[in-house]
Amino acid sequence: MDLYQAIKERRSVRKFKKTPVPKDLLEKIFDIALWAPSGMNRQNWKFFLLTGERKEELVSIASTSFTYLEPQLQKLYAEKPKIIEATRRFFKRLGGAPLVVCAYFEPANAEDMTSFQNVAAAIQNLLLVAHAEGLGSCWMTGPVTVEEEISRFLGVEDMTLVAEIP
């Protein structure tokens, strides 16, 4: 698959096969993700990959973020209650994804937008390579509303959660 095709055809997937992703394929995906550009070449991102019980625990914690998103969804999709219910179901199980990635960055200071952009570029690489390799993904920002709980669970300090990616 060429780059143009990957960019045009990649979609957010919300229902996954239970098939584990081979370790060598994950290494390939993360290797390419980390080739993303970064301001001042800081490369100050960190990715946490969770599977099995740890993934299930994370999903349980992150699913509480739906409570914070529901009022926004009610406004956006007042005429489409099925979308709201589908979103609620997705947050509870993440579509059965076999793994979840949490993407963080280490900020240089309180107003550090460069670091946010750095990790966003790496996430985009990750999503495109996963798609090119036949894997689905979904860039989720909702779980950021429960960042403190997720970070405590992962043992992360002094970093900012940007996304959860099943």
Residue ranges and their predicted role:
Residues 1-96:
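N-terminal amphipathic, basic helical "cap/leader" segment at the start of enzyme domains
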Residues 29, 33, 101, 106-152:
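Small-aliphatic-rich amphipathic alpha-helix that forms the alpha element of a beta-alpha
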Residues 42-45, 132, 162:
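Short secondary-structure junction motifs
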Residues 67-71, 154-166:
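A glycine-rich helix N-cap at a beta->alpha junction
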Residues 79, 152-154:
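Short, surface-exposed loop/helix-turn segments at secondary-structure junctions
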Residues 96-99, 135, 158-161:
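Short coil/turn connectors at secondary-structure junctions
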